[in-house]
A protein has these predicted regions:
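Structured core elements
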Residues: 2-3, 18-20, 48, 54, ...
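Residue-level signal for inorganic ion chemistry
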Residues: 8, 59, 88, 108, ...
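Conserved ATP-binding/catalytic segment of the ANL
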Residues: 9-14, 18-73, 90
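Conserved loop-to-beta-strand segment in the C-terminal subdomain of adenylate-forming
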Residues: 15, 64, 101-125, 151-166
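Adenylate-forming
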Residues: 26, 60-89, 116-137, 156-161
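C-terminal boundary motif of the adenylate-forming
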Residues: 52, 57, 90-115
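Conserved C-terminal "lid"/linker of ANL adenylate-forming enzymes
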Residues: 96, 104, 145-204
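Short amphipathic alpha-helices in soluble, non-transmembrane regions
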Residues: 126, 142-147
């Protein structure tokens, strides 16, 4: 196992890089597909997993997120959506979330836990005349609560600008992962350029 920078240069301990592996249990190539093989293997035969991580002084590997999901901030900071989503999902009223970028701002798409919401705002169940307006007011309050909750726990360049409610459950892949590309496209995230999808020289925090 080793951590890479720019595809093939090993990272020093403590710095974030792409995880590469090699061994008996790792595939050697894509069958009869040299082009795809070249994309995921280094010239000396290490398989690039697409995961970003760093090694602690005592040898523990910590995963930051996926290389293809990384967002480069306005001043070149590496922002890992999965780390922000972990904080979002720890909020009692958040069922699931996705962090994306829009016009240089970080946006959290959040699907709220309806059972928890109705337990908090139980009175809304019984007054159908006022329910819609009152519910929207409560949701606005909750979005502000979640925004403050997350921004108090992440570094300054990972702070959210806005929380947007996703009323329907997120569309998932067969492996139960959110189809990020659908929501990135829907909410205006700029396409990731090849040169921007590489970790900058950032110390692990």
């Amino acid at each position: 196992m080793r951590l890479l920078s720019d595809g093939c240069i090993s990272r020093p301990q403590g710095e974030v890089g792409e995880l590469a592996v090699r061994g008996p249990g790792v595939m050697k190539c894509y069958y009869k597909n040299p082009e795809e093989t070249a994309k995921v293997f280094t010239p000396d035969g290490w398989f690039r997993t697409g995961d970003l991580g760093w090694l602690s002084p005592d040898g523990w590997l910590y995963i930051k997120g996926r290389l293809k999901n990384m967002i480069v901030g306005p001043s070149g900071e590496n922002i890992y959506p999965e780390e922000i989503e972990s904080v979002l999902n720890s909020h009692v009223f958040v069922a699931d979330s996705l962090v994306t970028e829009k016009e240089g701002r970080l946006i959290a798409l959040v699907h709220f836990n309806r059972d928890e919401l109705e337990a908090r705002y139980e009175e809304l169940k019984y007054d159908w005349e006022m329910k819609k307006d009152a519910w929207e007011k409560r949701i606005d309050e909750l979005k502000k609560e979640v925004l403050d909750y997350v921004n108090s726990q992440v570094n300054r360049f990972s702070r959210l600008s806005e929380v947007v409610e996703e009323k329907e459950e997120f569309e998932m892949t067969p492996t139960k992962k959110i189809k990020r590309f659908l929501y990135n496209k829907r909410h205006g995230k700029d396409p990731v350029k090849e040169e921007d999808s590489k970790p900058h020289n950032t110390e692990a925090k």
